[in-house]
Amino acid sequence: MAKQVVIKIEEGSFELGFPVSLEFLQDGRIIARERKCPQLPPNPDFPRVYDQWRNIYTGLGNIYTESFPDFRVIETQEGQITHVSSLEDCQNATLTLESNVRNWFGQPIFGAITARIIGELKDGTPNESVRVIVDTSNDYLRKLSWDYWDLFEKPYFLPQAEFALLSQYDRPTKKLKQSIKILAIFGSDEGGLQLQQDRELIENLNKYGARITSIPARGNSLTPQELFDSLWLGNWDIIFYAGHSSGQTIHVDHALNLSIDLLREALRRNAPRVKLAIFNSCDGLGIAEYLADFNIPHLIVMREPVPDLVARRFLKYFLEEFTQGKPLHTSVREARKHIFMIHLPTLRVI
């Protein structure tokens, strides 16, 4: 039986705190609600500390070019001030951010919320998989490293728990049929992205019985018409995109950026059939927010830029777990664990 806990965070602020309520679901059906939860405590320093870390982290891209020849980065706007960061600066900023987040999660209110969640799930088996969904429209809360919370870190609480983000949830996930249909979309490889290796990872799934359509054909550039037609005509279980993105824009080729809103009608037609969308690109929260309106059950995005090698390794580890029949959120958790073993400043951005 699939269990979910939805932590609904209402409008608030880091200065005053955030109202919160809980919903418990089993097999897509709400079985309990908890509306009298303690309010999340204030954390007025978090936006500043996060922005400082993010500026240093993205500025580190020039250094990582030596080790990782391609970096899925957010494009700099004209007139924007940028700085080249050192690895030490990034490590220090990461420690400051981690300390801020751990101190926040260490406040008694989070212990009280944990107790209510554990109390509601006390009849579950110790190794039962539980999906904990954080439902918020606040950008900073979406980017916060929720896996620092004891609810996820302490194995004696929910050892098989995995957090997810979303702004809407209605449609329970249907089990994927044995022969799944995958649309693999490959955008711009500007900056030296090794999209050919992403393509090989996806197309290798045919050995598990998946039916894969890749666009564009090898050696060609993606066009908006090809993208629209493929989304419109297909009956896809999984949509996969690899390339660059920023906000709600994907980079079709070196000279063309395409607003995902131009694909609205094609998405409206086929999104009800889609079980999973994966965007192996930087700055994916804008795309995730847009696609949430189409009620796709599962979206995997990068919350911040990551080196291309790391994005590809995450994809590899995730697909290895997922194709063995493990639940999606369990596959994401295991892939994250693999990635955290790579000694980079911080990779809690997927």
Protein language model regions, located:
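Non-catalytic, solvent-exposed interaction/assembly segments
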Residues: M1-W146, F152-K154
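A domain-level signal for caspase-like cysteine endopeptidase catalytic cores
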Residues: S137, R171-N257, Y290
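Catalytic cores of nucleophile-dependent amide-cleaving enzymes
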Residues: E162-L165, I238-Y317
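Active-site proximal helix-loop segment of RNase H-like, two-metal nucleases, encompassing DDE(D)
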Residues: F314-K326
